[in-house]
């Protein structure tokens, strides 16, 4: 069931990025969509690319729902998990890039790339999608495909 859901999410994300937009929205929805995209973009840039876990409360609700089973639900669970992850040493050339952000009202999807050189000397790349639901200017929910 989970693999089926992940396959559906990946398919939906691929279509959204191939088209370049999720949906046509009314002008009021465009403003909401742009604000929500900015929240997610700023969160991703500040907290995940910038590795600044202490900034997470500016972006995540206390009751943040995390659908990735490797990260506990709630702001505290997110912060505890990412403090541990960010304490781990990364390859010197590790890079995380935000490639695209699309949204429709309260739903925002990002497309990102991670690159690094492994201990084997080989260059590695990982591409991923993350989907967020924004509520009242704060990230309320997160899904990802791996």
Question: Which positions does each model-derived feature cover?
Answer:
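Short, low-complexity N-terminal intrinsically disordered segments enriched in polar/charged residues
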Residues: 20-58, 62
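Bacterial N-terminal signal peptides that target proteins for export
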Residues: 2-12
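Bacterial N-terminal signal peptides
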Residues: 11-21
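A short, structured loop/turn motif at beta-sheet edges
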Residues: 101-108, 133-139
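A solvent-exposed, acidic/Ser-Thr-rich amphipathic alpha-helical stretch
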Residues: 53-104
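Short beta-strand edge/turn micro-motifs at domain boundaries
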Residues: 127-146
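Hydrophobic/aromatic beta-strand elements that line small-molecule binding cavities or substrate pockets
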Residues: 82, 96-101, 113-114, 127-132
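Short, cysteine-centered beta-strand-loop-beta hairpins and adjacent loop/turn segments enriched
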Residues: 88-91, 116-124
């Amino acid at each position: 069931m989970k693999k089926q859901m992940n396959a559906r999410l990946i398919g939906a994300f691929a279509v959204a990025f191939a088209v370049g937009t999720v949906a046509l929205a009314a002008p009021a929805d465009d403003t909401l969509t742009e604000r929500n995209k900015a929240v997610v973009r700023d969160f991703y840039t500040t907290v995940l690319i910038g590795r600044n876990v202490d900034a997470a409360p500016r972006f995540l609700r206390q009751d943040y729902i995390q659908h990735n089973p490797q990260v506990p639900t709630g702001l505290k669970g997110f912060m505890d998990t990412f403090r541990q992850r960010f304490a781990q040493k990364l390859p010197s050339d590790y890079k995380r890039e935000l490639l695209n952000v699309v949204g429709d009202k309260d739903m925002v999807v990002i497309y990102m790339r991670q690159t690094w050189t492994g201990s084997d000397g080989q260059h590695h790349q990982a591409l991923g999608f993350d989907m967020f639901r924004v509520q009242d200017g704060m990230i309320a929910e997160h899904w990802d495909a791996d």
